């Protein structure tokens, strides 16, 4: 039976470049791979055709011979010689094609596995609001893995050094034939590092790292808030056998303040005033992070009114304008009244015309009028 054209098998033009051929091969090989079509003889035959076409068209010399002489170039005694026949010859390595698709099967490529970078560490730092707003330097002590001072991270005893792995010759990977494919795996002798330690350091037992605690001075910039994270490069755990160290991340948590609440760059506080000041107006001393200031309260101030003190908030660590302090007035009801005070309040209430006095309590008048209308509507 006549063989099909290799370009036709892969569905590419004769002018297709290697990238297009590889793309077509990957798509078709995935579709007709024997593992996906177990027991399907037709799919197995197509897969053999696809592999054969790919092997010829990605080899410069074989492709040139095929373009000139067709299949005759690879028949016994033909121009190509070598007796190419499906899976039987050629020995092509397909792990580069499937490396991104079947990474686990083929060992993820041909790169030598490097010694592992040190792990990143996290430290939770609690700050007062004042420390967060103004900035502070704090000393912290953390347990970590540091580079061994005896072998300087190599893991080998003093006077010796790691030896090139005799199994993989420093490549970190070995090739194994599995069925139709040449599979790359991490070297079982050196575990992918490309070197072995024949005589390990007595201090770190060949790991290149030892357990220690270290003290660091951490500078917290002004304006940080809960959830902010500060990175100290290279202050994490030391890497294995001389690999780079990880980083230390300081996680900021600001304690609740007894006066202020922070919302982004603004501060909020509640300022209690008595009902006399609320009615007549006056001045009251309020706290800020910069010290005490006087707040002018106008006459007829209602509870819940916000007063903004510009520039008395927080300057964010990310820059921008400084926030404001917003004071929320809370009008306090007097308690523990004596008889004289109660009498005076009753007289004052009578002068207002009762709880629904229109002139002195406009909101109360509106409220009670609404209540009266509500009940009138119910009884109709």
Swiss-Prot record:
Binding of Zn(2+) 2, residues: 165, 168, 187, 190
Ligand binding (Zn(2+) 1): 148, 151, 201, 204
CDD domains: DnaJ, DnaJ_C, DnaJ_zf
Cofactor: record remark: Binds 2 Zn(2+) ions per monomer.
Essential cofactor(s): Zn(2+)
SUPFAM superfamilies reported for this sequence: Chaperone J-domain, DnaJ/Hsp40 cysteine-rich domain, HSP40/DnaJ peptide-binding domain
Protein name (record): Chaperone protein DnaJ
Protein species of origin: Erwinia tasmaniensis (strain DSM 17950 / CFBP 7177 / CIP 109463 / NCPPB 4357 / Et1/99)
